[in-house]
Amino acid sequence: MPCSRALILGVLALNTMLSLCGGEDDIEADHVGFYGTTVYQSPGDIGQYTHEFDGDELFYVDLDKKKTVWRLPEFGQLILFEPQGGLQNIAAEKHNLGILTKRSNFTPATNEAPQATVFPKSPVLLGQPNTLICFVDNIFPPVINITWLRNSKSVTDGVYETSFLVNRDHSFHKLSYLTFIPSDDDIYDCKVEHWGLEEPVLKHWEPEIPAPMSELTETVVCALGLSVGLVGIVVGTIFIIQGLRSGGTSRHPGPL
């Protein structure tokens, strides 16, 4: 991937008392909202407009379909957002990008190496539907390819990605979800491609299935269990006999 693309990031409103430029101990906030985070990159006409709350995506504006896409459908039943507002912000960023590029003497953005982690949403049970999550952090600039592989073959069904979400250091993170049914015959990889990586990174995942006990192990376990049981019987018998003897010697003949 070429690394000479320019980037502009606009945060139009920040509904929080937290200073992103200050230290962590400056001001604490219970909730943080990014309302109107606009990203545009050129060439390629790549951009996004999102609203976030406490690090979770509320919605984004699909630039191709020109519509608002809610992270959860229930959000769209509570409030409305016209996609034209996001499209206008993208157009403004696109207009300003050329000016800022010239002022920066066409200096390209520094490419950071992203970090990826793969984990299941719920405890894994073979044959039970689950979701794999690929969490990719420290993304900059926000252009990345995330691909799911099952047994080294690309998977597209059951895949969902969030938009780029903003970190406090102005880098980004992104989550990719894959719905699947765990099987001991399948292995999965999350493939990450980014300008900051010399080669694609594969994060491997496969279900951890306890190895069955061998016949020798089963025999040893049974023998140990039987031995412990026999020892318990012998010790119990000894205590009973001692108790009876102790009770017999403590008896005294009563008056006639």
Curated annotation (Swiss-Prot):
Keyword Disulfide bond assigned: yes
Keywords: Adaptive immunity, Disulfide bond, Glycoprotein, Immunity, Membrane, MHC II, Signal, Transmembrane, Transmembrane helix
SUPFAM superfamilies given in the database record: Immunoglobulin, MHC antigen-recognition domain
Residue intervals passing through the bilayer: 219-244
Topology term for the membrane: Single-pass type I membrane protein
GO biological process: adaptive immune response; antigen processing and presentation; antigen processing and presentation of exogenous peptide antigen via MHC class II; antigen processing and presentation of peptide antigen; positive regulation of T cell differentiation
Signal peptide: 1-23
Cytoplasmic compartment spans: 245-256
CDD domains reported for this sequence: IgC1_MHC_II_alpha_I-A (cd21006)
Glycosylation sites: 145
Region (Alpha-1): 24-111
Disulphide bond pairs: 134-190
Ig-like C1-type domain ranges (all copies): 114-206
Name the record gives this protein: H-2 class II histocompatibility antigen, A-D alpha chain
Origin species: Mus musculus
